Design a protein with these regions (language model features):
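Gly/His-enriched, cation/cofactor- and phosphate-binding structural elements
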Residues: 5, 12-17, 22, 47, ...
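Haloarchaeal acidic low-complexity proteome signature biased toward cell-envelope/secretome components but also
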Residues: 1-16, 78-93, 100, 111, ...
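Anionic-ligand anchoring segments at beta-strand to alpha-helix junctions in alpha/beta enzyme folds, i.e.
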Residues: 14-77
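Short alpha-helices
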Residues: 113-180
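His/Asp/Glu-rich metal-coordinating catalytic cores
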Residues: 57-85, 89, 93-104
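Glycine-rich, Lys/Arg-enriched anion-binding loops that position phosphate/diphosphate groups
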Residues: 166-237, 244-251
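Short glycine-rich anion-binding loops that position phosphate/pyrophosphate groups of nucleotides
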Residues: 24-25, 94-97, 116-118
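Divalent metal-coordination and catalytic microenvironments
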Residues: 26, 36, 65, 114, ...
């Protein structure tokens, strides 16, 4: 049987489905959860819920949830533990309990559908395809093969997710993404796609991106910078996307202090660099980090710096020094910045 048929039969024997999104879910994760929920409904599961943790702070992600009216509930540990027989737990766009999610390590997972690199997947149903550009591509394949009702909301969600995850089919896109988009295109709401593609940007996000630009240092073709302390988590990937287009830059890494953690976002077009592996090597011993060859992220608890100082300015200086040093070591770079660096970042 195909993966779609195997999944459908597995779902048809269950009575309840809990879908857990990864922390701070993006459109690929959200659209995949929406599609899996529709498949579960078609398979006869009446009790379904989608849980998330972290923030949906990116303007595009907020618009995605609001305009498509996606029903989400805050993560509840009780929902994934001590489950009744016939109750299934599913991960979409992530794969391992405790890795980029709040599910306790060791929790049994029934379904995993993902395209991110991972070597520790353990579930009854696993469809793990690193070669595809988006998890939504896999779910679109299921929807198509199983003849699930493709209404405007689902088609728009899946198509936008694929476009966003592949940066308009320019990053990691395969033939599968184009095939999926061709199938979804006639069913999607074009006006809604335009609204999702051009959300408003907050002043705080612009300020954070401006700080990243000001603090940049460049070594070879690698740019490293920080946004200081911010509440705008999604300013980091937006800054990384923008700074990766700077002339002479192939890799851009942006970090910042958010609440009690250091968040890291990276983008790379350098064929010699697997930025996900580089971040994992640099931070796996103190936090969680990893991702694809071209895009990756990470999180390091601020608590490991708590013994140094309680002053935010001093703390930022220490964080900048330590995080930058680990990045330089992970990428085999020297500590001497080039002339492209911002003057204020090297004074």
């Amino acid at each position: 049987m195909s993966p779609a048929q195997t999944l459908y039969e597995f779902l048809s024997e269950a009575s309840e489905l809990t879908i857990v999104c990864h922390n701070n879910p993006d459109p690929d994760c959200l659209a995949s959860a929406l599609a899996l929920g529709r498949i579960a409904a078609a398979a006869g599961i009446d009790t379904r819920q989608v849980l998330y943790s972290g923030d949906i702070s990116h303007q595009q992600n907020r618009a995605f949830v609001n305009l498509l009216d996606i029903d989400l509930e805050p993560f509840d540990p009780a929902a994934v533990q001590n489950r009744d027989e016939g109750s299934l737990l599913a991960f979409v766009d992530h794969a391992v309990p405790g890795a980029n999610n709040r599910v306790p390590e060791g929790t049994p997972v029934d379904i995993v559908i993902d395209h991110h690199p991972s070597e520790e997947i353990d579930a009854q149903f696993v469809d793990h395809r690193e070669a595809v550009g988006a998890t939504a591509t896999i779910l679109t394949e299921y929807v198509r093969e199983l003849a699930i009702d493709l209404d405007t909301t689902l088609a728009t969600a899946l198509l936008f997710a694929i476009r966003r995850e592949t940066l308009g089919f320019l990053r990691g896109a395969t033939r599968a993404e184009y095939d999926a988009a061709g199938y979804l295109h006639d069913h999607a709401d074009r006006d809604l796609l335009r609204q999702l593609s051009s959300p408003s940007v907050s002043g705080a996000t612009v300020d954070a991106i401006a700080t990243a630009i000001q603090n940049r240092t460049v070594r070879g073709s690698v740019l490293i910078t920080h946004v200081g302390r911010t509440n705008e988590r999604d300013a980091l990937p937006q800054a990384a996307d923008y700074l990766a287009t700077l002339e002479g830059v192939d890799t851009a890494i942006v970090f910042g202090m958010l609440a009690e953690a250091i968040q890291i976002s990276a983008r790379s077009t350098d064929a010699r660099v697997h930025i996900g592996d580089a971040l994992h090597e640099a931070f796996a011993d103190v936090g969680s980090a990893g991702g694809h060859r071209e895009m990756a992220g990470g999180e390091v608890p601020l608590g490991i710096f708590a013994d140094y100082t309680s002053d935010d300015t001093q703390l930022l200086a220490i964080v900048d020094q330590v995080i930058t040093a680990r990045l330089l070591a992970g990428l085999n770079l020297t500590d001497e910045p080039d002339d492209q660096s911002s003057p204020s970042a090297t004074e």
